[in-house]
Design a protein with these regions (language model features):
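C-terminal transmembrane helical hairpin of 12-TM major facilitator-type secondary transporters
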Residues: 217, 243-247, 253, 258-312
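Intracellular juxtamembrane helix-capping segments at the cytosolic ends
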Residues: 20, 99-113, 304-317
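Cytoplasmic helix-loop-helix junction between adjacent transmembrane helices
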Residues: 89-127
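Hydrophobic core of transmembrane alpha-helices in multi-pass small-molecule transporters
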Residues: 72, 84-100, 209, 290-304
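Flexible cytoplasmic inter-helical loops of multi-pass small-molecule transporters
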Residues: 169-190, 381-388
């Protein structure tokens, strides 16, 4: 439920691009840069939050993240300057999402189940976040239609505070995890040094950059893009919602089959599939049917990357510092998110079209497939077992 709310609130921000820019007389690059800051803030604070969760427990981190999240949404409702926009929806919401989302919650879920059920748990957690995208985006659109965008943000800010209560059940499964692989004592700095010298880990970080580029660009700009080509604003909201719905199944299936299939090959397939889907979407004339099909296919591949990616981190280094090390991987994801969101707005303002960003997404998908291919699916030498299935 916590992941549902955290991811759901954030997924609705693309709906505010047009009303916020029109109300303040800004170009789309302004709010795009704010959303880019949000993604970068999320990435930086994800690594920090992961380290704090490993040290002090997930509950305290989630409560802190909830406060930042609610404050950022509330301040966005009264935004009348660029610096306030960047501070609210950018810095504060980004920090809030970092403390209430995958990087903090998924490691706690992994520790709560036996080793042979870890990938299943990762799939369930990722699917829960996707359910939030499916459920919350139409609700946000309805709130905007009924009360206006300012009141809608106020309602969301108050609702976000409820996430703090949902963190309490995580208490037994957060903080220090038993280093079940071999009882090797390692501090967080040593874990970071070990990871940064690991070639497969660095390839994983670079590939996850592409996932962030795709996801953030489409989430932030799809509603405005569809409106520009002649669709009703409701179509944009439902497109993002369909992505969330199909991702529930994609993420769950990805988590379930990651126990049986090669995680690196699964990731190669996902990224190539995205490139094919985007290419066909841009080449075939736009219609309601093509929007629905594209949204469904992209949704199925959307966060299907998370179970095998986080699973590879657990295989390589174990679960002791998984929140922190996955946070570093996620920082790569958010650097991609920053690039996708900001570049989308910048190119639109300078060229009047999103086409170049779509085709860049195709090229990056191919790049991601290539860098995942040589990843080694085995543990570091200090772990007792040569291969830990998770």
């Amino acid at each position: 439920m916590l992941l549902l709310l955290s991811f759901g609130f954030r997924s609705g921000f693309g709906l505010f691009v047009k009303p916020v820019t029109e109300a303040n007389g800004w170009g789309r690059e302004v709010i795009s840069f704010a959303l880019a800051i949000q993604n970068l803030s999320w990435g930086v604070f994800a690594a920090v939050s992961g380290g704090l969760a490993d040290r002090f427990g997930s509950v305290k981190v989630v409560i802190g993240g909830t406060i930042f999240y609610a404050a950022g949404i509330w301040l966005m409702a009264g935004v009348d300057s660029v610096w306030l926009l960047h501070t609210s929806v950018g810095l504060l919401v980004g920090a809030g999402v970092a403390g209430t989302s995958f990087g903090v919650i998924l490691p706690a879920m992994v520790r709560a189940v036996p080793k042979n059920q870890r990938q299943w748990a990762l799939g369930v957690g990722t699917a829960a976040g996707s359910m939030g995208q499916f459920a919350m985006v139409p609700i946000v659109q309805q709130l905007m239609d009924t009360y206006g965008w300012i009141s809608a943000l106020n309602i969301l800010a108050v609702s976000a505070l409820g996430m703090a209560l949902l963190a309490i059940p995580l208490a037994p499964y957060s903080g220090k995890a038993a280093n079940e692989e071999n009882h090797f004592e390692q501090n967080i700095l040593a874990a970071l040094k070990e990871a940064l010298k690991h070639r497969s880990y660095l390839l994983l970080v670079s590939g996850f950059f592409v996932c962030g580029f795709h996801v953030a660009f489409i989430t932030a700009h799809m509603p405005a893009f569809l409106s520009d080509v002649g669709f009703d604003p409701q179509v944009g909201a439902w497109s993002v919602s369909i992505i969330g719905l199909c991702n529930i199944f994609g993420a769950y299936i990805s988590g379930s089959i990651s126990n049986r299939l090669s995680k690196r090959y699964l990731l190669c397939f996902i990224y190539l599939g995205r490139s094919v889907a985007i290419s066909l979407f841009m080449l075939i004339p736009f219609s309601l049917t093509t929007v629905v099909i594209f949204s469904g296919v992209m949704g199925f591949l959307w966060l299907a990357t998370i179970p095998p990616t986080s699973g590879l981190v657990a295989i390589m280094f174990g679960t002791r510092y998984m929140a922190f090390l996955y946070g570093i991987v996620f920082l790569g994801h958010q650097l991609g998110s920053f690039s996708g969101v900001w570049l989308g707005g910048w190119l639109y303002d300078h060229r009047g079209s999103y086409d170049m960003v779509w085709w860049l997404g195709v090229a990056l998908g191919i790049f991601a497939a290539l860098v995942h291919w040589p990843i080694k699916e085995r543990s570091v030498a200090r772990l007792a077992e040569p291969l830990n299935k998770v």
